[in-house]
Amino acid sequence: MKFDVIIIGGGLAGLVCGIRLAEQGKYCAIVSAGQNALHFSSGSLDLLAKLPNGQAVSQPLSALETLAELAPEHPYSKMGQTGQVGELAQQAESLLSRCGLSLVGSAAKNHLRLTPLGNCRPTWLSPADIPVAPLEGPLPWQKVAVIGIEGFLDFQPQMVASALQEQGVEVTSDYLHLPALDRLRDNPSEFRAVNIARVLDLPENLQPLADELARLSSTAEMILLPACIGLDESAPLEALRAAVGKPIQLLPTLPPSLLGMRLHQALRHRFQQLGGIVMPGDAVLRAELVGNRITGLYSRNHGDIPLRAAQMVLASGSFFSNGLVATFEHVYEPILDLDILSLPNRADWSNSNMFAPQPYLQFGVNTDNRLRALRGGVALDNLHVIGAVLGGYDPLQQGCGAGVSLTSALFVAEQIVSAMEVTL
């Protein structure tokens, strides 16, 4: 089986890279081992929220020069300074829009999004259906009703209300009861956001839901709900807003996250619409190397039949997705045993304070400045690395996980197109 490009991993980075390559006429395949981390995502995308020294960042693009001094191994530092990463961030915003995603925000300045705990945290892009606020000044909401769903344990309205009250917002909290959900409620393991959304999205449940929300939010100017409506699109939420006559915004729930799933579905649909091939439930087990070039990939489902392409992209994710594997002695990349940025002493891998930066989060594959994978200190000619499997950055403490995935994906797509034009 032969393609122009094979991408190992179907998460945010892999899909975005595949979309950009397919938009430029490349025949791409994505080998995806299973459910990716987007299903656990809030739907918001971070670019850069903190520098490695802990300094908060309000304007991500203006902080890249300082970041390069503090963290030369950071993917942003390798991809270039403000101009390069800023251009890639703008390209990412345009690409996501072409996928039909309605997002708010700009790479020029972070904004605040409301979390499921009622706190605010800075981010780059957020779904239009979640509550956001400017980085400075008081919150824009005066009277809010936070309404949960009776029996739904993955969202606690009182916790959100308490946090908002501490920030000066007048809040009420309550639970709605809808008879249509009673069958699901009898089985707690089935009472999850995705299954609830399938019920609430039905047209016959719109008016009963609207009546219940109107009853519980009589004095409120805005309603906050758990993200349990609009499984495939925002039309059910828009209809509910019209029926209630008030702004209604969604807060992410515990996984599986409906907002993250919608992001994944939109990206995958766009990739396949452009002619891309997705091989779900498969995993690349080994690679065939001739010199510094990969000539074939062997996967679990295809056995001895190699997958061949002129260019390969590793987007296999971090430990969560088995893109990196840790033993008691060391961390390694399981397909090609690529060079890893890590620490030799296991005692240094983690910090006993769970809220402190964890060194292992910066572990990942080492690359050259073109994001080509290093193996034995030598760059492989046709293997680029993108997303969470990259080393040199802390996606949680630095608030840059999605940004690295998006910008590295687009950066590598450009590298691949240029390389393939040279070889034609």
Curated annotation (Swiss-Prot):
Pathway: Polyol metabolism; glycerol degradation via glycerol kinase pathway; glycerone phosphate from sn-glycerol 3-phosphate (anaerobic route): step 1/1. Its EC number is 1.1.5.3. One of its GO terms (biological process) is glycerol catabolic process. Its cofactor is FMN. It catalyses: a quinone + sn-glycerol 3-phosphate = dihydroxyacetone phosphate + a quinol. It comes from the Bacteria. Keywords: Flavoprotein, FMN, Oxidoreductase. GO terms for molecular function: glycerol-3-phosphate dehydrogenase (quinone) activity. Conversion of glycerol 3-phosphate to dihydroxyacetone. Uses fumarate or nitrate as electron acceptor. Composed of a catalytic GlpA/B dimer and of membrane bound GlpC. NCBIfam families: glycerol3P_GlpB, PRK05329.1-1, PRK05329.1-2, PRK05329.1-3, PRK05329.1-4. This is Anaerobic glycerol-3-phosphate dehydrogenase subunit B. It comes from Yersinia enterocolitica serotype O:8 / biotype 1B (strain NCTC 13174 / 8081).
